[in-house]
């Protein structure tokens, strides 16, 4: 359940971006829509793997504070998403050439890199976790394009707000769980 919530939260940037694309490019063909959703999902799959292996490389040095690191990273990302959701500016949509599709997929998956670092402190199967994150992102991004096509850019901010709230919740859950395990609370 926690992994699905995390996957949903990480997918909100990609879904919001693709929702804006749906509002902007209403006549885009299904193949292009599928490709964009695939790239968004692929980067959400790839970045936690990279973050995980970066985290493992220095985990022995910070294992006593890993829960604080996870808490601060998730809360920072969550508050960043909340700030974006409350901003009066609507994010830039991708143009539809291959270069900007890659840039958009990379930019919306940077949060997943940081989450991959936090997952290196947990007893998880990183490949399975990253695969679920990528699949959820793909599905949500695909659906988001069509929602954007019909509902417009107004929903973009609500998706960012929900994703930010979920990341903050997960950060607090990790912190409280570890503090309870250590007998601090």
UniProtKB/Swiss-Prot annotation:
One of its GO terms (molecular function) is manganese ion transmembrane transporter activity. GO terms for cellular component: plasma membrane. The chain crosses the membrane at residues 33-53, 61-81, 101-121, 126-146, 160-180. The keyword Disulfide bond does not apply. Keywords: Cell inner membrane, Cell membrane, Ion transport, Manganese, Membrane, Transmembrane, Transmembrane helix, Transport. It is found in: Cell inner membrane. HAMAP family: MntP_pump (MF_01521). Probably functions as a manganese efflux pump. This is Putative manganese efflux pump MntP. It comes from Campylobacter concisus (strain 13826). The lineage of its organism: Bacteria, Pseudomonadati, Campylobacterota, Epsilonproteobacteria, Campylobacterales.
């Amino acid at each position: 359940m926690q992994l699905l919530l995390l996957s949903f939260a990480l997918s909100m940037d990609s879904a919001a971006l693709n929702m804006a694309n749906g509002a902007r490019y209403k006549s885009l063909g299904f193949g292009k829509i599928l490709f964009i959703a695939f790239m968004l999902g692929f980067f959400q799959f790839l970045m936690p793997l990279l973050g995980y292996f970066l985290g493992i490389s220095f985990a022995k040095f910070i294992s006593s504070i890993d829960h604080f690191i996870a808490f601060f990273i998730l809360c920072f990302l969550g508050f960043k998403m909340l700030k974006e959701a409350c901003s009066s500016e609507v994010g830039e949509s991708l143009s539809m050439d291959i270069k900007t599709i890659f840039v958009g997929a990379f930019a919306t998956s940077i949060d997943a890199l940081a989450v991959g670092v936090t997952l290196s402190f947990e007893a998880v199967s990183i490949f399975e976790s990253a695969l679920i994150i990528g699949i959820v992102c793909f599905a949500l991004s695909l659906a988001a394009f069509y929602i954007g096509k019909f509902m417009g850019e107004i929903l973009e901010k609500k998706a960012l707000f929900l994703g930010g709230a979920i990341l903050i919740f997960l950060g607090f859950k990790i912190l409280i769980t570890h503090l309870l395990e250590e007998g601090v609370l």
